[in-house]
Amino acid sequence: MCIRDSPEADSKLIQGVTFELMGNCGMSFCAPLSKDNKYQLQERLNRYGIRKEMDWNNFDDWLTEIENNMPSINVAAQIGHGNLRSYVMGMEARQANPDELNKMKDEIQKACDQGVLGFSTGLWYAPGSYSSAEEIIELAKIANRNNILYSSHIRSESDDSSGLFPAHAEAIEIARRTGVRVQISHVKSVGPKFWGRGYELIEGIEKARNEGLDVAGDQYPYYWSSTPISGCMFPRWSLEGGREKTLLRMKDSDIREKIKNETTNFINRFHGAQGCVLADYPEDTNLEGLNLIEISKIKNTTPEESVMQLYEKSEGSFILHSMEEKDVNEIAKYKYMCVASDGNSLKADGPLSSGKPHPRSYGTNARFIEQFVSGNKIVSFEEAIFRMTSYPAERLSLKKRGKIALNFFADINIFKINEIKENATYVSPHQYSEGMKTVIVNGQISVINGKKVKGRHGKVIRSFSD
């Protein structure tokens, strides 16, 4: 919804981003929409005081909605498996039956016909976490038939029941079984058991590529991640049936204790309670920017109980110290790793300036250049540009984007490398990056000397030739 309600996309455009792919991690909240999906979407918007009539149901109408608002940057969509599954079968923790699986296949085909360029899964998040590999394989076959990208927030990035390396292998197996192009989203190794082992993820991708599989990844260049409260603090079984069912479980003292015991394990993955910072919590903005130790002192209880009390009042999100520098650097060096923010297009004023979101929305690309190219020099300038421009376009099969070439759309940045600077921080995230002298979108100048100029020149991309 960010790109519709704030088509200026300031946090991205000012740092030189001219294209955004929506719907990652299985979360295409805006399509397809059932009555229940619309209610859930409005609940999310209510937290920011946004009330919008949702008079669309499918991708065609949703993308037209964005077009009518004239975005500042180019936009393309993915159909998210989590949204698709809830559209067809709700939040039930079970396998899809044949009729439900066929309906999901049909919806993917409809979405492809209406202009989506990707199919995404969030296999860590409910309800995607309730699906089997076989379900994803069957759906990925439809993606492959239409030559769209399959991107996946894999089933685990740490040491829970699935496990990091089996989850990584599952994504590669989907490529092997279907032929689909696989993009492993925000590649990372989380938790004490996996810190220092990021290189093994790269070895896995390289082995798959040597086998002839089209597998790659993307990364945001930070040591902290960001996830909704329910997504990072509670076991998957406790989320079955959606928020209302979860709240009912929390009222049962025995179940509550069971959830809290598992929450302890989650907290320990993030360098403890001090590594869990509440980023977005409209219910009580005074708590935003505080870590779980500080919140627990205010609430006079444990970090685990504090998390549950927060969620009982409202969903929110945490920034989490989930990674180590060595792993982030190792992954950043890999040539088949795109740079991708995993963050929304935001603004430093208005409803989208609320909370203390992850600074990646304002600084991913600037940080990659400043830290890995100019700073520790682990990535060459030429390779950094490739991994932010032509390689992402290639992954999406975009035929006229990502390069300065004859008959290509002119999406161009002009800058001096030593002037690129990220200003957003975890404490003060709503700050624009600096250093872009000129940003050109579809041949039209959109930024001069770091300042936006009048007009919005982005397009909704619905085909590989747009």
Mark where each language-model region is.
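Short, small-residue-biased leader/transition segments that mark boundaries at the very start
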Residues: 1-3
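Acidic, glycine-enriched loop/beta-strand segments at the rims
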Residues: 318-328, 376-385, 393-430
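Small-aliphatic-rich amphipathic alpha-helix that forms the alpha element of a beta-alpha
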Residues: 5-24, 107, 384
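Divalent metal-coordination and catalytic microenvironments
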Residues: 16, 75, 115, 153, ...
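Active-site neighborhoods of metal-dependent hydrolases
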Residues: 62-66, 72-74, 78-91, 95-98, ...
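Short acidic, glycine/serine/threonine-rich loops at helix termini
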Residues: 5, 30-36, 86-92, 131-133, ...
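C-terminal cap of metal-dependent C-N hydrolases
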Residues: 245-246, 252, 330-336, 341-342, ...
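Hydrophobic, small-residue-rich alpha-helical packing segments that form membrane-like cores
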Residues: 28-34, 40, 47-177
